[in-house]
Amino acid sequence: MTEDISAQSASGGPASSPFAELYTRAVDSLLDIQVEDRRIETASGQTHLLTAGDPAAPPVVVLQGGNITNPVTLSWFQALADEYHLIAPDTPGQPGKSTGETPPAYGPWVCDVLDGLGVDDAAMIGASHGAGVLLEAGVHAPERVTAAALVVPAGFGTPLSMELVRIALPSLSYRVVPRGWLLRQALAPMFTRRASGIDGIVLETIGEVLREDDLAAEFPGPEAAALSGFAAPALVVTGERDPFFPGERTCKRAAEDLPTLVDCLTLPGERHFLSPAGQARATERIRSFLAGQAN
C-alpha cells in the first residue's frame, strides 16, 4: 500500500516536482513486497518512511543511497522482509518525501526516527551514502545500533581516479545537454550492468538529479578517529570495481578504522550499483550476518 503523494514533492516542495512521480513508479516497478507509508516528526523536519514485513519481527533500518529514491535502495534488500520488519526512512536532503534540508549531522536524525517509532535499538543496513549515515549514528548513539551492514559504503574515503573523471565529465555535459547517451556514458562506470539492462526508473531518477543538481561529491561519515567508539558488530560488502569506494581499498580502510568489523566481503566484478546477482548475494550475506548476531 502506498499513499497519495500528489500533494507533495519528493523533497517536500511543490507537487510539480518530478521526484513525486518517480518515487511512486519506483515503488511499483522495483518492490515485490507490500509496503506501508508513515510520517514522523524529527528535529530535521517531517520524515517519511516505508515499512515492510511483520511489525512484530526484529526491526532492521535500511538507509538509502544518495541521488536515488528510498525504494530503489529498499529493493536491494527487500527479500529480508520475510524475516525482519524493514524500516526505510527517506533521508532529508536526498530525493524522497521527507521535508527539510540536509541535517548538520545524521546521528541525531536517526535517533529521532527510532524514537518516533518507539524502537529502542535496531540492526541497520546502509548502502553507499546510507552507510555513512549509519556510521554517524553508530558513533553518536552506539547503544541504538545492534548490528551494522555497510554495503558499497561511504565513510571510508574516496580515492581520485580516472573512473571518477569518466563519471564527472559526461555528468556535467548532461546538465547542459540532457541527452540519453550522455547519461548512459556518465553512469556506465558506476553500474555493473550495461545501461540497456538497468530499470528505466533508476536511470530517470539519476537523470533528474543531474538536471536539478550535481551528483553528490561529498559523503557523510565520521572522522576515522571517531570510529573507535563504534560498538556494533559490522559487516562490510564492497564491489571489486566500485569507482567511488574500490573493494580492496575500502576493506583495508574498514579493517583499520572499525574495531568491531566481523567480515568484509568483496563481490568480484561488481561496481558501485550492484547487479541483481550482486544485490542477492549481498542480501543473503547480510541475512547470515544478522542471524549470527542474534545467536
What are these regions (language model features)?
Residues 126, 130-134:
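Gly/Ala-rich beta-loop-alpha elbow adjacent to hydrolase catalytic centers
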Residues 161-164, 176-232:
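Conserved alpha/beta-hydrolase catalytic His-Asp/Glu region
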Residues 1-59, 83-84, 287-295:
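Alpha/beta-hydrolase fold catalytic core
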